[in-house]
């Protein structure tokens, strides 16, 4: 075997250098921008933030580390025991001795299996708790984002961050980190064991490391790119599905099913191609590493067999059949962790990429935040004042231009105007759904920016243009999961707003199921439920945004009756399409292009024959035309 020393030494030296290179390639960071993973956060920063979530569970990780030592010990010791058993079998041996060695091996195997099982159970439970905490933090943070920010971020993207990306992170806690450490120590331990057993054969094994390094570096480059494509395509298809499933009725109305199907097919095919590329990369890497493993085994069998037959020895150590068997097992245990390290590192980078996406949402500063000296609003009279308020959704494109008006407590004020005049925007600003750029908005003489947002919104009952009902029951949608509200109180409120007239006809009453977005109820029924939901929380100011749009005449009469009753609750601000519903308002404010052009009572504005008169006349003639068409 000494004849092969020059080749073995050269190969081993190259192997050691290559091992250092692979460590540098996989461990040393190459800056923030990495191939296939465009990132803005450093790995160390991401890891630190992830560890902050793991810190409360450090005891569990200590136990896992202790259990992992048994698995590492088994991987290192078991080949030596099997080699010893093989030597006993081929030579003269006592049956008791063989039994003791076999029993010892079985005991170590059982202990290792038990440790691996408990390690997996602890990691799964701990990892899921960590990810559950992260998801909760993410959801709570999303709830704090302003309306403007929620409008900018697609719903599908938020869903992907909360589900797919957190699942990718969970893999790191349940598998990757522990196995990365385990594989690293197994490689070191096996290398030391092989050197201790026979360094000549160890040199032979090291000769194959340069090829593993080459394959791993190439694999790293392409696999990370493939990971990124899969993630981007997954986010894209989730966003598309979220949007188009919500708008499926529009798709059907305009007969766009085929066109939408083609778009979905394109996105689905893009995801399929990305996944195929990922499978192809892994499918090439694994056989190549397996080929190196087989090559090293063949070299072991040739060199080991030749040395065994020739009785070659080194430093007085004879090359035995048991040693060859041990090395055969060591080679398998040496190559598997190296292959796993390459793959697991890329999965880890994928988890880091997902973590950065999650943290990018968590790092979004809510645009609506309480001022440091914000006060708690205990009770309000309902006096509202706008003082030269300017607002724009897009910088420079003013939606409101110097709007000023005053609302006395208990008054009912209506806002009218053409689409885009700023009616709904005014109502959104009062509740601080958006932040205005100039001027002041006062509630009982207090600037709303000096009031805590939660405290402010508790005093307002908001009914937005699009009435949103959650999946659940009528009861859960009215109380919004708030405890302490009895069914009697709920029915009293429903009776107050005339919602009981259709609830009592339902098979399950308050327990009637509500499907997604309340699509099993009519627009008018959803509006009445929205009234009940608002009133039951006892607001001081009622905000009705286009409350009587798109409903039947019978339900409109019920809603008008409800609105008359609600005037007694407190200050009421109304935006309505049908001007007939606001004739009894204390004051009507007419807006055009973001400015107040008229204000007064219904009769005063009609007498002035200005913008309100034009809108009212136009709507009156349209309603008369609709009635005549209906008679025909």
Regions found by a protein language model. Give the residues of each.
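A short amphipathic helical element positioned immediately N-terminal to and/or at the very start
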Residues: 43-57, 158
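Juxtamembrane helix-loop junctions of ABC transporter transmembrane domains
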Residues: 26-43, 66, 74-87, 108-155, ...
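Transmembrane helix-loop-helix hairpins at lipid-water interfaces of multipass membrane proteins
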Residues: 1-37, 61-115, 196-200, 302, ...
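Helix-loop-helix
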Residues: 91-100, 193-207, 277-356, 361-362
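Hydrophobic alpha-helical transmembrane segments of ABC transporter permease domains
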Residues: 2-3, 66, 74-78, 84, ...
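An intracellular "coupling" helix at the cytosolic face of ABC transporter transmembrane type-1 domains
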Residues: 55-59, 147-148, 164-173, 177, ...
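ABC-type nucleotide-binding domain
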Residues: 363, 370-371, 377-632
């Amino acid at each position: 075997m000494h004849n092969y020393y020059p080749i073995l030494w050269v190969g081993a030296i190259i192997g050691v250098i290559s091992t250092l290179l692979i460590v540098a390639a996989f461990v040393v960071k190459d800056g923030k921008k990495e191939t296939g993973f465009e990132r803005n956060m450093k790995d160390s920063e991401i890891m630190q933030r992830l560890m902050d979530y793991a810190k409360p569970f450090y005891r569990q990780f200590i136990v896992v580390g202790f259990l992992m030592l048994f698995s590492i010990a088994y991987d290192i010791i078991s080949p030596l025991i099997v080699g010893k058993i093989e030597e006993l079998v081929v030579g003269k041996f006592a049956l008791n001795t063989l039994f003791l060695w076999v029993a010892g091996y079985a005991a170590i195997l059982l202990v290792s299996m038990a440790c691996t099982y408990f390690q997996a159970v602890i990691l799964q439970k701990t990892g899921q708790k960590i990810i559950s905490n992260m998801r909760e933090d993410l959801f709570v943070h999303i709830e704090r984002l302003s309306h403007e920010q929620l409008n900018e971020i697609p719903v599908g993207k938020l869903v992907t961050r909360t589900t797919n990306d957190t699942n990718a992170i969970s893999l790191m806690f349940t598998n990757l980190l522990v196995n990365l450490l385990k594989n690293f120590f197994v490689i070191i331990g096996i290398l030391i064991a092989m050197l201790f057993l026979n360094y000549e054969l160890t040199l032979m094994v090291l000769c194959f490391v340069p090829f593993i390094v080459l394959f791993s570096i190439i694999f790293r480059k392409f696999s990370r790119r493939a990971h990124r494509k899969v993630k981007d395509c997954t986010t894209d298809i989730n966003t598309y599905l979220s949007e188009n499933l919500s708008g499926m009725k529009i798709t059907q109305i305009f007969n766009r099913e085929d066109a939408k199907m083609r778009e979905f097919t394109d996105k689905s095919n893009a995801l399929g191609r990305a996944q195929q590329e990922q499978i192809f990369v892994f499918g090439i890497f694994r056989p190549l590493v397996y080929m190196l493993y087989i090559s090293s085994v063949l070299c072991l069998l040739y060199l080991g067999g030749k040395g065994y037959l020739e009785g070659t020895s080194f430093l007085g150590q004879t090359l035995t059949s048991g040693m060859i068997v041990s090395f055969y097992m060591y080679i398998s245990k040496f190559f598997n962790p190296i292959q796993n390290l390459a793959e697991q590192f890329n999965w880890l980078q994928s988890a880091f990429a997902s973590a950065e996406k999650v943290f990018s949402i968590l790092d979004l500063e809510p645009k609506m935040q309480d001022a440091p000296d914000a006060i708690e609003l205990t009770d309000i009279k309902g006096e509202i004042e706008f003082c030269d308020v300017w607002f724009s959704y897009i910088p420079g494109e003013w939606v409101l231009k110097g709007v000023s008006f005053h609302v006395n407590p208990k008054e009912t004020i209506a806002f009218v105007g053409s689409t885009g005049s700023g009616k709904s925007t005014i109502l959104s600003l009062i509740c601080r759904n958006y932040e205005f750029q100039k001027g002041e908005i006062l509630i009982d003489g207090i600037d709303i920016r000096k009031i805590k947002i939660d405290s402010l919104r508790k005093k307002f009952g908001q009914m937005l243009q699009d009435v949103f009902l959650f999946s659940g029951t009528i009861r859960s949608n009215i109380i919004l999961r708030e405890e302490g509200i009895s069914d009697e109180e709920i029915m009293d409120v429903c009776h107050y707003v005339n919602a009981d007239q259709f609830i009592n006809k339902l098979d399950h009453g308050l327990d009637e199921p509500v499907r997604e977005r309340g699509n099993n109820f009519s627009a008018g029924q959803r509006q009445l439920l929205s009234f009940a939901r608002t009133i039951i929380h006892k607001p001081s100011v009622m905000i009705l945004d286009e409350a009587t749009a798109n409903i039947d005449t019978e339900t409109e009469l019920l809603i008008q009756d409800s609105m008359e009753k609600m005037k007694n609750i407190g200050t009421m601000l109304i935006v309505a399409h049908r001007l007939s519903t606001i004739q009894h308002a204390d004051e009507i404010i007419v807006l055009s292009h973001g400015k107040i052009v008229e204000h007064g009572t219904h009769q005063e504005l009609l007498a002035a024959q200005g913008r309100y008169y034009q809108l009212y006349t136009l709507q009156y003639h349209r309603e008369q035309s609709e009635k005549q068409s209906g008679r025909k």
